[in-house]
Regions:
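Short, low-complexity N-terminal intrinsically disordered segments enriched in polar/charged residues
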Residues: 1-30, 132-134
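Hydrophobic alpha-helical core bundles mediating ligand binding, dimerization, or RNAP-core interactions
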Residues: 9, 13-16, 28, 56, ...
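Hydrophobic pocket/interface hotspot
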Residues: 9-12, 23-25, 32, 48, ...
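A solvent-exposed, acidic/Ser-Thr-rich amphipathic alpha-helical stretch
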Residues: 23-79, 125
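Short, cysteine-centered beta-strand-loop-beta hairpins and adjacent loop/turn segments enriched
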Residues: 64-65, 89-99
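Hydrophobic/aromatic beta-strand elements that line small-molecule binding cavities or substrate pockets
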Residues: 69-75, 88, 102-108, 119
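A short hydrophobic beta-strand element
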Residues: 77-87
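Low-complexity, intrinsically disordered terminal/linker segments enriched in charged
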Residues: 116-134
């Protein structure tokens, strides 16, 4: 069993940001699941790596590829990690429509790969998140 470290978590996100599927598969399991919070068209469970990557592509499309996460902290346990991020972006075609929220991503790991992820949004960020993606 691979040890979860802050470096491993960062490498997983770096692979995801690269868009290189071969690199992504080193850290994200093919049978992973991901829960997108809120009540908007993107919300709900994403099944498998393809479902998750499809969600990420839609985030890029809707934000004109402006969406990014500034990682503030990473916490780890034997089979899970939680990272605190500031998620920022603006809606494609509407520069005034901005997203700026604080989020925790809770990740469960198996054999060095993410098998489950869930997002949690702080404070009034949930309303902002829903309005941004709706």
């Amino acid at each position: 069993m691979a040890q979860i470290t802050p470096e491993l978590v960062q490498q997983a996100y770096d692979a995801l940001a690269s868009g290189d599927r071969e690199q992504i598969r080193k850290y994200w399991a093919d049978d992973m699941i991901w829960l997108v919070p809120g009540h908007n068209p993107l919300s709900g469970w994403k099944q498998g790596l393809d479902g998750f990557l499809g969600f990420m592509q839609e985030v890029g499309r809707l934000s004109g590829n402006s969406f990014h996460m500034d990682r503030e902290a990473i916490m780890i346990s034997s089979d899970a990690s939680a990272d605190v991020t500031r998620n920022i972006g603006n809606r494609a075609g509407d520069e005034a429509r901005k997203l700026d929220i604080n989020v925790i991503h809770y990740l469960r790991w198996r054999d060095g790969k993410v098998i489950e992820g869930r997002g949690a949004i702080f404070g009034d960020g949930t309303a902002q998140y829903d309005a941004f993606w709706s």
